[in-house]
Structures are given as structure tokens and as C-alpha cells.
Amino acid sequence: MPIITSLAAAVLASAFTGATAPATSSLPPVTITVSASAAVPPTLVKRVLEETDAVWRPAGFSFVWRRETDPVRARIDAGPCLAPGLRVTIGSGRAADAERRHENTMALGWIEFDDGQPDSEIYLSYDNAQAYMIDSRGIVGLVDRMPILEREFLLARVMGRALAHEIGHFLLASKVHTARGLMMARHTASEFFGYERSGFAIDAAQRQAVAARLRRSSAVAALHDVR
């Protein structure tokens, strides 16, 4: 039976802990296909992906975000990449798991596991992220009084960090949550919306596990012209 692993957001304040690890990997970028609902502003999608990049970059990993609407030329020019077949959907609706709440938490993103293996699709909920930001007014202030740009920056932080967590489940091929760092099951509003990313650090063991799994993969796509 499929198991849904989701990142729960807790509406609580906390101090930032942990340290960002130095980059150690020399692997090619990982290609991820992205699609977004028409209701999600393109500028927000761009910022979400930039935030996810910023979480993973200090650990030595990078991504090539391939949009379904990208021209073929752009895909060719991307260069050699690891292509594990991961797809991210940024949806404006509430999928079956999207409204799940437990002990003052809300699911922002999720990935399914079947027989211990991660599915190839991650769902990120735009609606839930907006609702969570409104619920976090004790941390971010009143959303309806914010300039649009400020609201988008805050949404990009929470959504980008949630996406980074779900990508972690995929790259680690594990449902396991940790006591600290990126793979914690729950993060507080202070961690999600704060400027610092220290609460989303990737530790040395996780870096090594992801690098080893990617190196074992034979799905290396040379996305350039063969001459």
C-alpha cells in the first residue's frame, strides 16, 4: 500500500539551530521536471525553485529545473545531468492529503512510497502554503497588509524549503525523518519564514548517502548535441 510522507508545518516559534555543511560533491546537476497550476504566479515558481536550490547548494548538490513548456533547445543546452525521473507538481488545489491537519500542523508537500521506494512525483500545495502563512501571523504579521512582493518572498521560502525536504526523501530513498535539519518531520513557522536556513541543514551522512545513490545510478543523460 502506498504511504504518503509529508512535511508538516507547525505554527510555533523557535530559535534557529544547526549549521550549514560545506559543499563536498562534484556530481553533475540533477534534472527535475516542474509543472505548476495556472493559478500559481510564474514569479513565485521561480523563487520557490531558487529557495530549494539554496537549501541544497551548500551540501554540494544542484538542480536543473526543466519546465514542461521549455523549448527543446533549452533542454539540449542544459549540459550533462543526472536524470532520475523526478517530477514536481505545484498545485493550487487541495489533493487528498492536502487538508490533513494533526496537532496544529499542516502538510505543505508530500511524496508517496510504495514497497519502500519513493514515487517519482512530489506534490507541493500552493493553497496550503498560503493558509499556513495566514495562520502564522504571530511570526510574519498580517498577510492582508503585506505588499505583494513581500508576500511572495515569504511564500517562496516556505514552499522552497518544503520542496527541499520532499526532494530529500526522494534522493535518500527513505521515509525516515531525523531529529534535526532538513529531514525533520516538522518545522516551525520561525524556521520556515526566517531569513536563515540553518534549520534545514543537510548533514554529512545524508550528503554521502545521496551522493552514493546518485553515483550508482546509470541514468546519466548527456543533454547536448552529439557531434
PLM ranges: what are they?
Residues 12-15, 88, 106, 178:
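Generic detector of intrinsically disordered, low-complexity, polar/charged segments
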Residues 31, 60-64, 182:
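Residues at or immediately flanking beta-strands
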Residues 1-2, 9, 74, 88, ...:
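Residue-level marker of intrinsically disordered, low-complexity segments enriched
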Residues 3-28:
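Bacterial Sec-dependent signal peptides at the C-terminal "C-region" and cleavage site
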Residues 42-167:
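Metzincin-family zinc-dependent endopeptidase catalytic domain
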Residues 23-24, 33-49, 113-158, 170-227:
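Metalloprotease/metallohydrolase-associated module, dominated by Zn2+-dependent proteases
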Residues 21-30, 66-84, 173-179:
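Generic structural signal for short, solvent-exposed loop/turn connectors between secondary structure elements
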